[in-house]
Amino acid sequence: MLLFYVVRQKRDLEASYRKLYDINRSHVETGEKKAPRATNLLKEDQKQLLLDGIRRVMEETDEYCQPEFTVATLAKLIDSNERYVSMVVNDHFGKSFTEVLNDYRIKKACERLTTNNAKYAQLTIAAIGQSVGYKSQTTFVKQFRKCTGLTPSVYQKFVAEDRRNKETGS
């Protein structure tokens, strides 16, 4: 009787993890974000220029994967100041710069965990974390779980399972 209960709990947990994985894959693919908040210190055209610069750096480069990447680094890359960059990030994403940075890093980690690229396919979870800017595996796992609801190893397990299913045509 106890064995039946344990097996059922494990199956239910696996099903919950699968749902979280599927949800997170769709978020990674669509790039969903929270609703913006309003700020009046910058003109709309200034906000848009800053936002375009922020997006360019965060989406077209891997600069944010550097462990020492900060709001000051981002501001310097887009020729602005920290305060304005921080305000635009808070306004557009509805999150702090650190939260947005972690979101981008975890999204990149998910991409690297799902890629068939030989460069990343053989890396350990700690190495994937380092490749996206985390100095500590513990911090990486904590942030990964906070963003996705799964640990990197569980996520990787589902990626492998999806690959096997695609190969067998299931």
Regions found by a protein language model. Give the residues of each.
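Binding-interface segments
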Residues: 140
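Membrane-proximal linker segments that couple transmembrane helices to downstream signaling/catalytic modules
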Residues: 4-127, 131, 143-146, 153-154, ...
